[in-house]
Amino acid sequence: SIRYADMKNGERIDLGRSPSYSGRARVTSYEGMVCASNNDAAKEHEKFSNPTIVHCPDGHTVLDFGQNIAGYVKLSVKGEKGAKCRMVCGEKLDTNGNFTVENIAWKANYDTCRFQSVDFVCDGVRHDYKPKFTIMGFRYVLLLDWPEDVDAGRFSAIAVYTDMDTTFSFTSSDAMLNRIVKNTFWSVKGNFMDVPTDCPTRERAGWTGDAQLFFNTGNYMMDQRAFFRKWMRDVADCQKGNGLVYNVNPTGGKKSGLIEWISMEGSAGWGDAMVTIPYYFWKRYGDDCLIRENWQAMEKCIAYFSSRMGKRNLFSLFSPKRSKYD
C-alpha cells in the first residue's frame, strides 16, 4: 500500500500491506466550489524500455533511458520480506560519471532526503509497480540497495503530459537544428502536465512569466487551446481582490514560497499574463473566448497596475510613492 505520496518528492510503498479503511481521516473544511476540469486529460505517452545499465565509478548502479522526460518509471521488483530499497530519478551524471541531483535539488543527499524518489518495503513476492501520485523529471535512475540483480527488461520510463495534438513538424539537413527542434518539443511535453511549469523537477510551478514567454512557441507546436482555457481559469480564480495576479498559479497564497517570491508578487512580466495570454490566444487561434471569459479579471489587473503608477507612468511594485524614478 502507499504509505506516503507527494507530487514532487515521490512515494513510499509497503508491498506487504494492503489498503484499508480502518484508519481515521481528518475532517477539514473547504470553502471553494468544486467543478470539473475543462482541460484535456493528462495521459501516458512515449515509453522507453530496456535502459542502459551504468556502473558508476562510486559503485552505484544507474539506469540510463537515453531521453530526459517528465513522467515515471514502471518496474518489476522482488525482495525478501522487510527488505528496503530506493529508486531516485535525476537528469544527469556529474563530471566523474556519477549520479547527481545537485542541479535540481537544494538538498542533494539522496540517501536521506526525499526528492524524486520511490522507497519500497518488500514482502518476498514479485510486484509490478508504477507511481499513482507523482511524476518526475529524469533521464537517469539510481538504484539503492536493490534487492535483486538488475535486469533492464524489468524497467521502462513513461512520459506523462496533457494530451495535446501536434500541429508542427520540421526536418532539415542540419542535425543540430533538428535536435534543437526535438528538444523544444520535449520542453513542451515535460512542462505541460495540466499546468504550464518552469521545470518538471525542482519548482514545478505555474509561473506566469514562463507561460507567457513560451506561449507562442508552444501553441505553434501543439494545440493548447483547452490547456490554456483551463489554466487561465486557475489564474483568474487565484487573483486577489485588488487585482494583483500571483506570479505562480495555482498559488498557495501569501504563506507559501520564499520571501523573495512573496515580495515580488504581481510583478510586471509575470502578473500581466492575465492580459497578454488572452491576447496571444486570440492572435493564434482567432478565438476571443479567453478575452470574454476573463474580461473582468483583465480589467482588475489593469486597475491594479494603474494604481501602482507614479507621475511618469512607470510601474512600481510596492507603491508609487516609493518609486525612485519619479
Predicted regions and their residues:
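Aromatic- and histidine-enriched alpha-helix N-cap/loop-to-helix transition segments
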Residues: 202-210, 223, 265-273, 293
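N-terminal hydrophobic signal/anchor transmembrane helix of membrane proteins
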Residues: 216-245
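Well-ordered alpha-helical scaffold segments within catalytic/enzyme domains
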Residues: 146, 213-224, 274-290
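Extracellular/oxidizing-compartment recognition motifs
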Residues: 1-201, 210, 226-229, 245-262, ...
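Charged, long alpha-helical assembly modules
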Residues: 250-257, 262-286
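Hydrophobic core segments within long, regular secondary-structure runs in both alpha-
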Residues: 178-181, 185, 225-236, 275, ...
